[in-house]
Amino acid sequence: LHKAIRRQRQMCIRDRFNTMTASWGGIGWLWNKPVAFVFIRPERYTYEFLEENDHLTLSFLGEENKKIHAVCGSKSGRNIDKVKETGLKPVFTEKGNVLFEQARLSLECKKLYADAIKPECFLDKESLEKWYGGAHGGFHKMYIVEIENIYSE
C-alpha cells in the first residue's frame, strides 16, 4: 500500500470513481485462480462503474472507520462526494485503480465473469421472496473477479 501511496503523489488525481459498502460476497479459489465475488444491484451508482471497467478494488476498513462505513453504506455517490464527506484518502495503483489509505487490506481485481441473478434459477423460493419480493430493488448482478494484487498496511 505504501508503494501505491507514493506512486499516487506523482500521478494526476483521477476524478471519476465511487465507493460503497457491500455485504454480499466472498473470497475463494475458482478456475485455478484466487477470486472474489460480489453482488451489486443495478440501481447502485457503483454498478455503472463496474459495467464500464475491467477492474475493481475491494478495500477492507477496520472498526475504527465505522463512520466511513455508515456514509458509504447510506448515501449515493450520485449525490455527494464520499471522499470529501468521509475523509477517505484515495491512492492509485500502478494500473490506475483506486484504493484507500485507511484500508487495512485492499484487493485489486480483474473481472472474469458477470451475470444477473435470475428468479427462475432460485431453488429456495423463500430467499427469492425475502430478498427480491416487495420494494427491495432489482436483482443483483454477480461479478467473479481474479485477485491480481493484495495491499495491506
Give names to the regions the model predicted.
Residues 1-9, 13:
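Single conserved hydrophobic/aromatic residue that forms the stacking wall/gate
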Residues 15-23, 107-109, 145:
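Short beta-strand/strand-turn micro-motif
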Residues 82-91:
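Short, structured beta-strand/loop micro-motifs enriched in basic residues and often containing a Trp
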Residues 93-103, 131-136:
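Exposed beta-sheet edge/beta-hairpin loop segments within beta-rich domains
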Residues 111-153:
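Flexible glycine-rich active-site/ligand-binding loops centered on an Asp-His dyad
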